[in-house]
Amino acid sequence: MKKFSKIFFYLTAVVLLSWLLPWLLQFAASKPGNDPFTLYSCVTKRFAYIQSSKDNGVKRYDANGTEYTVAQFDSILPTFYYRQLFSKDRLPDTINGKEVTPKIIAHGNFTFKQSARDVNVTKPALNMIMESMPDRIDLENPIEAFRTTDRITFIDMRDNTVNEKKSALFDKVMKQKGFEFPMRTLSGNPTNRKEYDEGYLMVDNNHRVFHVKQTKGLPYVRETGVAPELGIEHVAITEFSNRKTLGLLTDKDNNLYVLNRDYTLHKLPIDKYDPKTNTLTIMGDIFYWTLKISDERGVTTYAVDADSYAFADSLRYDYPETALDKWSKYIFPFELSFTSYDDQWVKPRVSMGSCWVLILNFVLAALFYSM
């Protein structure tokens, strides 16, 4: 019994130390590391970024290393600093042959961000649905939700009753259009804090992508024509102010696509993007999209043409390796953690260090035990 108690004590100590020691070292020695704020310039046709440090303060450069003053930096990024330029009467009338005004620029600008924590979540069983064509100008808060099994069922949230008539109507139309239940995934944004509503993008059991929304209480169902062979696995509805795009899609091979409102599909000319492990940030304007794909080692930034989605440029920024990153795998044979930046679940996670450290620990433990 005494021997069992010792074994239990040592095992408990190992588990606790494998969790606490790496956490304490990370807490005490880690330094914040942020990638520079980067955008693609429609003027210089190069990336421009802001670099800040304790020694040099805030500096502004382009990809060639040319340093800019604040005013010059505003001028090479006119679609981002258009308010500042307009207030100083420095906003040009045309850029690259296109007429520009504050209204035109604001209408074309958008920001999109999706992290692994947004994707790696338990999907709700119920999804709210809005009226896409309300009687008034402003969108109204949703009063109904739906769930999907081998059919779609609508529930009135005011009294928690099933709307059999609407359920049967939507189910009939969706199946007539070729929708195969059960549904694999969907994306929507049921809030009235937006300019318009496009309902949901849904991926059926056969990997076909459908556009589903409610207009005047009736079903609007369209198959988008995305090839099922692509194996679309993740969708994100956009609803940007310019109303050009409908959503962003990724397939089984982690290729990223943009789906326009006319249901034309365009593969973006970037390397692989895995929604389960990467963070995607897009800052777009009427000339270019700047896409940033972040991973644990750094950030790759791409620029694509806003009209043709053609590749313009790319830039890689690797996070500086700290002494903690370099030596932690040689200090700890394994680490235990319960949370991750990639999801919102709390569960045990074990990451292994160097095998030689594990062997050395066993040798030291044996020597200590023999003494």
Regions found by a protein language model. Name each.
Residues K2-L11, P348-M371:
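Juxtamembrane interface at the cytosolic side of transmembrane helices
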Residues T215, Y220-A310:
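Membrane-proximal low-complexity regions enriched in glycine and acidic/polar residues
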